Amino acid sequence: MPCIQAQYGTPAPSPGPRDHLASDPLTPEFIKPTMDLASPEAAPAAPTALPSFSTFMDGYTGEFDTFLYQLPGTVQPCSSASSSASSTSSSSATSPASASFKFEDFQVYGCYPGPLSGPVDEALSSSGSDYYGSPCSAPSPSTPSFQPPQLSPWDGSFGHFSPSQTYEGLRAWTEQLPKASGPPQPPAFFSFSPPTGPSPSLAQSPLKLFPSQATHQLGEGESYSMPTAFPGLAPTSPHLEGSGILDTPVTSTKARSGAPGGSEGRCAVCGDNASCQHYGVRTCEGCKGFFKRTVQKNAKYICLANKDCPVDKRRRNRCQFCRFQKCLAVGMVKEVVRTDSLKGRRGRLPSKPKQPPDASPANLLTSLVRAHLDSGPSTAKLDYSKFQELVLPHFGKEDAGDVQQFYDLLSGSLEVIRKWAEKIPGFAELSPADQDLLLESAFLELFILRLAYRSKPGEGKLIFCSGLVLHRLQCARGFGDWIDSILAFSRSLHSLLVDVPAFACLSALVLITDRHGLQEPRRVEELQNRIASCLKEHVAAVAGEPQPASCLSRLLGKLPELRTLCTQGLQRIFYLKLEDLVPPPPIIDKIFMDTLPF
């Protein structure tokens, strides 16, 4: 029979004792099987044989030990070009009627100590040799009754478990080697497939197997990277019997993600099948429609029993009262049901109305105070350039200069008051016509109130909004008796000890009030109520519990006095118009004509 030459070297000359036993079967890194099937007619090794394993592993002889075991039987001759050789090899001379197998150690990652793989191993891998992820095997003696399976030199697989380290264990292991039909598989370390049956030979083996904790059953479409486990390699070792890991059935992913729990998918009212939630609760279509009709029609039901009737799939239509009460008890929301005004829209829970940023009393009060401070002159910037304390009184009529000064002070105050009003929260949202109407109607009142609050009646000083400071006598000819009424009001206002926040609210109430001819009186009223509430809360917080009502009433009692002083100011303007010394500015004339009470 012609020789099937080993891929990496020639067989050993004779199977000596060293060839049967490896120096250390637990140390090697790789086991690479090579086979040399020979017959009595086998020829010596061809000269084209590849270099032996020792050529590549020079210096690593201690790491790679070889051994032989003989398989009896007659091997049929091969029809090849080398069959004409008549000389026998050294291995066939030793055992002419048997076939020899040569195994080299191979590496097992994670099982036994040994050197890591080197560049030689990668070179051998590229040459087409197989790597097996099982632990290292042990040699087997030549046995007459051993019948090897018909395997190709490189198609055999050693399975997922290590063979026994005894001769008898290796024999039982090699008897059950299946014939691999596919191409060589890449290494897949520790990916053991589940065992399928017991094996008494493994139970007798001293090899200890410790199963992995990550047992897993595959579903459809999944496959292991290694061949199927051998039937004879079931883990019946005493070390596995007590673990319970392999005895416990592991459910697959599909089994775990099966049917939902018993309560899911059921109507919370009657227990019928329910596919989704309705009005906040998982209910069936029947209870959904019943609840919807009851809410839309505002139906009233009466229970003929004790208001505890059973509500289930069979008896849900017997008592409508108890059924509707159970709908409410499980959490169905009536506000979500669409009414006639919401047709075409999905019902939603009513949300809280969003308030503007300045809607809260604290924010509103802060805005009013800021607007007041920005519109008034600071104490450090008062203008005393025209102030004269000692002025001789003029008993005659006013001249043109005094009238012009009077008009200039009114016109300057109007522009400052307009800018102040624009900073009041909510005033800019009103229509332009309403803004002008409110501003022109309250101008004289605001002029008096702001002048009275800034002035110092005890010293006879009048501080105008522009920062100009004049003495009472300097304004007597232009303002007439009106200036004395303003100073009297100033003394009364100062006696109340009104602080800046309260005065800011009071000034806003003078502007934001009901006037004849408003286009949107409702919006003006809402803004007025917000400012009044803000003033009330501030006075209550400052004055204390016993006196908030009296303080607020005294403060609001100044508003009628302002109306009286406003009428007195209109009379003064009317008088100056009759004198016709200086024509009034157009804006003052318009205000006069629009605010006349007659």
Swiss-Prot record:
Fetal muscle and adult liver, brain and thyroid. Induction: Induced by cytosporone B (Csn-B); directly stimulates its own expression. Induced by corticotropin-releasing hormone (CRH). Induced by growth-stimulating agents. Residues 584-595 are annotated as: AF-2. Residues 521-544 are annotated as: Binds lipopolysaccharide. The gene is NR4A1. This is Nuclear receptor subfamily 4immunitygroup A member 1. Its main location: nucleus. It is found in: Nucleus; Cytoplasm, Cytosol; Mitochondrion. Gene3D superfamilies: Erythroid Transcription Factor GATA-1, subunit A, Retinoid X Receptor. The lineage of its organism: Eukaryota, Metazoa, Chordata, Craniata, Vertebrata.
